[in-house]
Amino acid sequence: MRDEINQGVYMEEITINGNTWQKYKGDEGQDVFIAKFMIPADDLLGKYVDESFYDVLIDNDADVYLPPECDMTKSQDCDNICLKCMDESRLAFKFRKNVFTPEEQLGAFEGLYDSAVESNNRGMAAGPRVEQSGHRDWVTPFQQDILEYYASGQPTPVDGSNPIETIIEKHKTKQHETRGSVWLRSKIEGEFGVYTGFFDVAMERFASMPVDEATEYVKDIRKNMISDTSYASPMWSGIAGFYGRYPRIPYGRETSYVEHNREKFEKCYPFARKLDKEFARLIPGRYAKQKEFADRLDKKFLIGEDTTLTTITVNTTTSDRNARMACHRDAGSLNEGFSNLTVITKDGKSWKGGYLVAPEVRAAINIQPGDLLLIDNMRVIHGNTPIEAPDSGIEDMLRMSLIFYFREDMDKLGTWDYEKTRREYVDSRRLNKEHELWRPFWNGVSPSMWHNEEWYDYLKAKDKGLEWLEDYHPEALEEKTTLEGFFE
């Protein structure tokens, strides 16, 4: 440990397991850590972390910065004191204890708890999948490799090794992937009689067949007995708030949960407003950037209509739900802004563990109900340690984590009424059996649908049609020599 005085600040240098941080007290009495290292951790994406992945456990107010972007060993005027190089661009996270009142937490709990359902859309965050999970029968990497070997005509290794034994050895310790296909159980049972143990029987069949016959048989299994939909490991997760456009749903909108539970959702507004206020106070530069985007957006797409937040990811862990996160970077939130993490509970129910770990800087945070973590979750790899039941028993396990953010794709939206009109237009096409593109199960969407006369004519019939054409479709007006007769 080395102590120094720099710019009137008492600074100490801490080294643990060969990793070094500079540490000093901030202007609010918080601990400030500056990592002088950055450990590559992309190989951890999709994998779980435990206590071996951090050296510093933070459970009091703290700021943690990534190392300076400069090369300290080559800078002639560098005094090896990183304080003067730190700004919001190097901030990994800020952690503050006891930010939210019990009333604010209760409102968030009641307003958001029911939005979390079993989900397969969390990708890396969902963690490694197991052979049977969430009512799905996964095609394991081992099974995939066996099928590939036989489908490829049983190629002979140049080293003379047994390819089946090589595949078995390869998968003895290898972690499963985070996303994959599933077996169609009904098809498997129709072919093999029972699902349990069928792959051992299948391997015996493959081995007993001539090469060409085995190849065709395996190709048939791949085609007809495996779903072509890719799934992630299931976890209890949900989205509340608002969405931007999506290719198959090309209009801004409320999430399904908010659309059907608006009054309940509004209970989270005081919590969201407190979070937004603390964001502005603690990271004013990044907040100002996010506010620029929020000010361009129709306020009806903002949570509470007065924050810089559009969307909330909700994850829950109870006695029968597990929301442990594998290592991941988040996507979709505004790059110029900043994200966050909070956890809440109800009736004093708690948990053990569940530390959020940032393995690149070897730090973990013990987030408890009422605390606020502001984190650069698009840049910093993070996951959490196992979440365990309290001493009172598994039935008292209850943990809900919330991530509030501004969705970057929402910057492309028009006004609330314009986006609503886009939705009405899609629905009108979908329900119109006389439409030239109509077919069973058509969703009403087609290529170039927003740049043709059918859409322009639809807008003409609306009170704000001319205004919307001028704002969002000037090309429609350019096609007319005058506006006279435009609304014929």
Predicted features by range, described:
Residues 1-240, 483:
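Fe(II)/2-oxoglutarate
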Residues 87, 97-99, 318, 379, ...:
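A broadly conserved detector of short glycine/acidic/proline-rich loop/turn motifs that flank catalytic sites
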Residues 23-25, 36, 47, 74, ...:
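Context-gated lysine
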